[in-house]
Amino acid sequence: MKIGLILCALTAIATSGCRSNRQEAFDFAGFRRLEPHVIENDLLVGRPSRPMILDSLLIYTDKFEGRLITVLNLNTGSYRRVLSSGRGPGEMMMIRRISYDSKDKTIRLFDNNANRLTTFSATRSFSDLFSVSSIEDVIDFSYDNVPFEMAPFGDGYIANGNFDGRQFSLLDGDGRSTGYFGVYPGNNDDAGSGDAFFMKNQTLMAVKPDQSRFAAAGYSNDQLVFYKAEKSGVPQKTREYFTFDADVETMTHEYGVRVINKPETVSAYMCLYPTDKYLYASYKGRTIEEMMNPDIEKVNYILKFDWDGKFIEGYVVGNIDDFAVDETAGRLYAFVYEDGDNILTAYDL
């Protein structure tokens, strides 16, 4: 299996068509291109996602034969499939988020199907990681109070959604909301439409491992906002980037809200990954129409920021899905979907 990039036609017209003329917050033309290296062709079996680096381990979701998570030792190539699918003790249904807390050395898994947040010890051995005996805490939410997504932050948790027109909810250690904050960018006229407004302006979140900072970014708008925890309560915004609003439609039906993309809908941020020093963000910045054009190069941009929100540098990579960064090794690991197969790929930073 080879990894290839679909190159733009080498003409002035085709090259200019690789990006539209809309205003953007960063100079993507000046980003450094990274070359891919195939790590594993056969290990990824489903649609792997949510990767996280823990020392020499790559942890990610990839449902296979009733197991939800794969733990791969990057040094030896050995791996384990862990966590059975179900609602019993030590089982999960649908993992929305994998978070690491460096303060207490724990891994938290948020299951938005079972409405449950489970905390595991991260200090266990390779053979005992994610075992039932390694569970340290479980928080169950009622159906009416379960957030769309949540992650440990400060002394509790942070959740995103539409909370009376606010972007985020600050939760205590038991998962109870202590207040809402954050203003959605751009046009807020329909903020009162609840879930429909949130799905239009849906955000990704990433939290610094020591829980002192977090960032959020838009799927269909290019808001990227940084916050730091405050002992007084409401987190303080330290930096925000924003140049264009979401251009999508929403449809409400009996099962919830559906987002409908248009040809001019821009796919903005795709994945955020936090390390001790930096936030890494992958960004497409192309419309649906552009992504369907075979003459336009299929690449993603990786943006690197410090936790105050200062832009450090940028890279150009292939058409990757989710990714994780091993800062010690200076390497970015990504999932690439090509010709019906998922490939674990690495880029040296």
State the predicted function of each range.
Residues 34-41, 81-92, 130-143, 178-200, ...:
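Surface-exposed loop and turn segments in beta-propeller and other repeat-based domains
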Residues 23-46, 308:
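A short helix->beta-strand "capping" segment at the edge of beta-propeller domains
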Residues 171-173, 295-309, 348:
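Beta-propeller blade signature
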Residues 121-154, 160:
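Asp-box/WD-like beta-propeller blade repeats and closely related beta-sheet repeat scaffolds
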Residues 47-52, 96-103, 147-153, 197-212, ...:
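Structural signature of eukaryotic scaffold interfaces centered on beta-propeller domains
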Residues 78-108, 112, 135-139, 317-322:
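Blade-loop segments of beta-propeller domains
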